[in-house]
């Protein structure tokens, strides 16, 4: 779905669950302002074709449940970075794994990057487990400076294009994850020529159910 200014309010709503702040690099008092800055930065990145943000919603209820970002690294040419936020009510339902699938796929197949890096909080055991299970390589802990001072401890994970094609694509096919051909074309068009001032539309990779 489209990246819009109103998504700042959505992220603020998610943050009202105290558990949310255990897994993001913001502190509670700064959430409203930083949530707005977060969306402003996402829109600016889209306009400059540096990063692409998508919000995923439930097919059943239409409720927005998560956000995933694919961004070209500012520091290293040929490398992309993936980040995501999942609404607390949607935790432990497998969405983080699906978002990671999509983020990796988008970076390798649409942005044509040679490697993708994903950071996870050192204390976030669930995220670290997912990334290791998908075959990303841990590069060890690092310090991440916080806007309000101090730092957080992060684990950085990396996967190369060859590893994605050899290891992860067969796993995606075995688990019957797929993107319809029409949506592949839409995603490619968005990556090559995103509209100014707003996000595009895409269907997150979904589990295809065989007809009974």
Language model segments and positions:
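Short, conserved alpha-helical segments within structured domains
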Residues: 27-31, 52, 123
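Short loop/turn motifs at secondary-structure junctions and domain boundaries
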Residues: 44-49
